[in-house]
Curated annotation (Swiss-Prot):
Its EC number is 6.3.2.2, 6.3.2.3. Residues 494-753 form the ATP-grasp domain. This is Glutathione biosynthesis bifunctional protein GshAB. Binds 2 magnesium or manganese ions per subunit. One of its GO terms (cellular component) is cytosol. Synthesizes glutathione from L-glutamate and L-cysteine via gamma-L-glutamyl-L-cysteine. Monomer. The gene is gshAB. It catalyses: L-cysteine + L-glutamate + ATP = gamma-L-glutamyl-L-cysteine + ADP + phosphate + H(+); gamma-L-glutamyl-L-cysteine + glycine + ATP = glutathione + ADP + phosphate + H(+). Disulfide bonds: none annotated. It comes from Pasteurella multocida (strain Pm70). Mg(2+) 1 binds at D702, E723. The keyword Magnesium applies. The lineage of its organism: Bacteria, Pseudomonadati, Pseudomonadota, Gammaproteobacteria, Pasteurellales. Its cofactor is Mg(2+); Mn(2+).
Length: 757
């Protein structure tokens, strides 16, 4: 099968580079010193019966992290990053993810528990593996790389060739060519990427075959790794022979099931191999790869891209390896696996030749410049083995003292990195924090997640056959269409609440700046709030707590409000403290005191300097990707300073509280303090009633309350509603400035999927 001519003549180079990718990464859970734990798989990850992202491989201690299929490797790595961060932050404080493939700190065999799965057949299969291979070999971890050619490419190639009549036969032979050539040249990938040079002597039943201080390239890929008995030989000459030989070994009892065949290439896309004859091979799984301990996720994006183009070259080349050449490739793999990592391989000339031809392919298919650089970098490693992963690893182990010590150091380092921005998912940092928090929780619980529109924060969540759509973290089908429209319009909100019998402050609405300013006399010396009719997140709001003192400030506040909307409200200011109630369904789940943006004087620094110092806090940022927002020093803040007789250059006295905003929104630099347990129950019930009046399932209700300990009475002096908000912020409740965290995203999930275990 010769396809490079078809690709070149029909300008299919770009389509040739497309495909689908998925990674499966195995890792041991360990203690701080690198010893494998004997604890059960953490219950926080839900049930392994259905979890699409977090599974266990052989043992309870052996995590398997699985990315969903993606069209771009960059997206595959985003998912791998997110799943890692979820796992790292969910593990017990004293547990870590071991970054090396070969196990260290092995417990006694009787302490190693096979994965305790719901399906008895899955447990029985693992118990069978124990009898055949022993437990220690099963504790080896690695990376499985799943790759599917673009179905459009396969269709185009089939139409443009004249050798095959059957599309299934063509597809099978295309993938089989990739598999056979991969097995022939797999030693190249092992030489460059192997990372299992040693293992503790306890791993071996009959003593270590390694001399003291001896290092090799890959124990995992050697006869001492996770391999079948040499007697078991499955033919790759054709799909028919592959199926027949695999079924033969199962029928004779040499393999308990087809999945026990541990080839470095596995044909995928069917439950039974025989199905390939009618439905075709759908993708390949490459199982060769050791964990790269120098990469936080066990593999680098550059190496994943190299593997991709290497796999493409396996079908680009005109030659197709036969079974004899496949066996030669296996023998060469075993030989290279036992070479010293700092010595040149005996087959360097062949390796260099293959990569030079690979570079030629990249040129002909119009590959990105980055791919040329990646391959050229690999090419240099044939003359300098110290640059290979195994070469680097040997030196790192010698420096650390042992593989276990190195693994422990890196495990602690990688866990610390996962907590640097503990409130965010680094790969989806462009999404708002509430959506990131929801993503964290659904991935943790095992709900299948599809990001429909990243910029619009739109998710599709699936549990079994149950599908829910979520926008902005808590906007769902449980809300009526009209409810956000009511809450968006502050005038309508007040009228609806007033009709429902809730206390609302009196207000006057204006549609022109001139008329509003001309009404100054109505509000002189009155404490008022000036705000746009339709707003959220505190935009355009000015509060005169001490009363309107002059026309100029009044006009300025109106001007700011009119920038946000064509209609503005001037509302009576209610005396008391403002609290945000987060309501979901029939329950107030969280109550927050939002302290307006402020700084505290120290008799040394100016207001501007104090603001800059407070803004340095790691939780402060743009407010959408951080739990707290940096404090601004704009027109509204300077008006607030003026009310206090200050400017940005004033130096406040020690412990002097300087208010920079009167409104308490976190989105304008405020501080968040959880008050859920302190708030009297009567106000929580009021918030639920207000939410129902809005026709909402989820609502952020803002109440002014003079005394949160006293029960509510019908009077406006007891409490008043100033706003009801659709899509209320959750992050300020999840990560408050002070007080107890309320993980509201979990409540959203319970609302959407009440059947979830």
């Amino acid at each position: 099968m010769k396809i490079q001519h078809i690709i070149h003549e029909n300008q299919l180079g770009l389509l040739f580079q497309q495909g689908s990718f998925g990674l499966e990464k195995e890792s041991q859970r360990v203690t701080a010193d690198g010893a494998i734990v004997t604890t059960p798989h953490p219950a926080v990850f839900g049930n392994r019966r259905y979890h699409p992202y977090i599974q266990t491989d052989f043992a309870e201690s052996q995590l398997e992290l699985i990315t969903p299929p993606t069209k771009k490797l960059e997206d595959t790595f985003r998912w791998l990053s997110v799943i890692h961060e979820v796992v790292q932050r969910s593990l017990p404080e004293e547990e870590y993810i071991f970054p090396l493939s070969m196990p260290a700190g092995l417990p006694a065999e009787e302490q190693i528990r096979v994965a305790q799965l719901d399906n008895p057949e899955d447990v029985a299969y693992r118990e069978y593996l124990v009898k055949i291979y022993g437990k220690n070999k099963q504790m080896v971890s690695g990376i499985h790389y799943n790759f599917q050619l673009s179905p459009d490419l396969i269709t185009r190639l089939f139409r443009l060739q004249n050798e095959y009549q059957s599309a299934v036969d063509f597809q099978n032979d295309l993938y089989l060519k990739m598999a056979k050539n991969f097995l022939r040249y797999q030693w190249i990938l092992l030489y460059l990427l192997a990372a299992t040079p040693t293992v503790e002597s306890a791993y071996f039943k009959d003593g270590s075959p390694l001399a003291k201080g001896q290092f090799v390239r890959s124990l995992r890929s050697s006869q001492y790794g996770y391999v079948n008995d040499p007697e078991i030989n499955v033919s790759f000459d054709s799909v028919e022979k592959y199926v027949e030989s695999l079924e033969h070994w199962v029928s004779t009892g040499k393999l308990i099931a087809e999945k026990e065949f541990y080839s470095n290439v596995r044909l995928r896309g069917a439950k039974k191999a025989r199905e390939f004859l009618t439905t075709g091979i759908q993708y390949l799984e490459f199982r060769l790869f050791d964990l790269n301990p120098f990469e936080i996720y066990g593999i680098s994006l550059k190496d994943a891209k190299f593997i991709h183009v290497f796999a493409l070259f396996m079908i680009w080349m005109d030659h197709t390896a036969d079974q004899e050449e496949v066996e030669l490739g296996k023998a060469r793999l075993a030989e290279v696996a036992f070479e010293h990592p700092l010595e040149k391989t005996a087959y360097a000339v062949e390796g260099e030749l293959v990569l030079l031809e690979l570079l030629s392919m990249l040129e002909q298919i119009g590959a990105e410049p980055e791919l040329f650089e990646i391959v050229k970098e690999k090419l240099t490693q044939f003359t300098d083995p110290s640059k290979t992963v195994a070469g680097r690893l040997v030196r790192a182990i010698e420096q650390a003292g042992s593989d276990q010590q190195l693994g422990a150091q890196l495990a602690q380092q990688y866990k610390a990195q996962a907590f640097e921005r503990f409130y965010a998912l680094s790969a989806f940092d462009n999404m708002e924090l509430s959506t990131q928090a929801l993503l964290f929780d659904v991935i943790q619980k095992g709900i299948h997640t599809e990001i429909l529109d990243e910029n619009d924060q739109f998710l599709c969540l699936k549990y079994g056959d149950h599908i829910e759509y979520v926008k902005n973290g808590n906007m769902t089908s449980h809300d009526s269409y009209i409810s956000p429209l009511i809450m968006e319009n502050k005038v309508v909100t007040k009228k609806v609440l007033q009709k429902a019998g809730f206390n609302v402050p009196q207000s006057v609405e204006f549609t022109s700046l001139e008329k509003a300013v001309a009404s100054y006399a109505l509000f002189e010396n009155r404490a008022v709030v000036i705000k746009p009719k339709s707003t959220n997140y505190g935009l355009g709001i000015t509060i005169f707590q001490q009363g309107v003192q002059n026309r100029e400030d009044f006009a300025k506040a109106l001007e700011i409000a009119f920038r946000e909307d064509k209609e503005v409200m001037v509302e009576d200011y209610l005396v008391g403290t403002e609290y945000r109630f987060f309501v979901l369904g029939d329950e107030t789940l969280a109550v927050l005191l939002r302290v307006p943006a402020n700084v505290v004087g120290d008799s040394v620094h100016s207001v501007a300097e104090l603001v800059a110092m407070k803004n340095d806090h790691p939780l402060r940022g743009d407010g959408s990707r951080t739990p707290l927002k940096k404090i601004a020093l704009g027109e509204i803040e300077q008006l607030q300073l003026k009310e206090q007789g200050l400017t940005i250059d004033s130096i406040p006295a020690k412990d002097q509280l300087v208010q920079l905003r009167a409104n308490s929104n976190i989105s304008t630099g405020g501080d968040s303090i959880d008050m859920t347990d302190e708030m009297h129950e009567s106000y929580k019930q009021l918030a639920v009633g207000i939410t129902k009046a809005m026709g909402a399932a989820v609502c952020g209700v803002d109440l002014i309350i003079p005394d949160l300990k006293q029960p509510a009475t019908p009077n406006l002096t007891s409490w008043g509603v100033i706003e009801a908000n659709f899509n209320p912020m959750m992050m300020m409740h999840i990560f408050p400035y002070a007080g107890k965290s309320r993980r509201l995203t979990q409540n959203v999930i319970k609302m959407l999927f009440p059947e979830l275990e």
